[in-house]
Amino acid sequence: MEELMAKPDIRVSIAILIHQNKVLVGWREADQHQGNKYEFPGGKVEAGESPINACRREVLEEVGLDLENYFKFDFIRHEYEDVIVSLNFYFAYVKAADLDKIKQPWTWYRRDELQDLNFPKANKPIIKRLNLLKKIKISEDILQLNQLEEGQYLYWRPESIDQASQLLAQMNPNFLSRLIVNIDVWKGLSELQQKMVKMVQLKHHQVMKMQISDLIQGISYFASCHDQESLWQAQRIGCEAAFLSPVQTTESHPEAEAMGWKTFANLAQKSDMAVYALGGLKSTDLATALQYYAHGIAGIRYM
């Protein structure tokens, strides 16, 4: 009986490079493994090399960028017919000053455009994670999770942190991937629940006092920001998205001065994160928000 040969197991590091909420994508040639498909920058981890150093080296060699901060994004182990790949994903933000250094033929794509590109199968969960929805409903009522429209997340703000895990246990676990909770709530959840929620939110004061080392690598963080300083700080520590508020006067915080769409646009277009407009908005304001460089909108009363 012919002895079966074990499939090679290859360690790979891959970079998700982001600039102004767009992702850098290339093309795999026909003679490469999984050729004639789109790809993110990256390559094999060499013997004795750490995955993050491999990522940094590959980006320098392939793209021409020597970036300082990489944040762990995900880990995927995928079995093809001929090989097993262990994929270490990292993400990094690219400054405007570095754009001219990028080698050809890399191209920037919007997050929602990625789902229309033919990537290797192992990348499918990453494409899904990068394609952030456009609307976020904010509520204290966890039952709203069962009533979300298509294309919505729920940012849940429970009255009692202590009961959060018990309440979530009563919900359909398939819906947790559309849930955002504050870090204090997240810490009280079960390990399984922590893995299933979409993002962990940081309040403004939490963002401003945190350092890169305070964030758990591989977790998606969503910051609450009110100005240029907090947006910059959120991006610096590795947040992937942010609320920017208040755009308009709100019933919940009438004393807060509204920034208006012009100021919002000026701040949002300078950020590399996915920025959501928040404050005095209703669902029909999405088209306006997109014109002013928002990735999407969020609201309490009208979502």
Task: Report each predicted region and the residues it spans.
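Nudix hydrolase/Nudix homology domain
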Residues: 37, 99-155
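Catalytic beta/alpha-barrel core
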Residues: 136-144, 150-233, 243-246
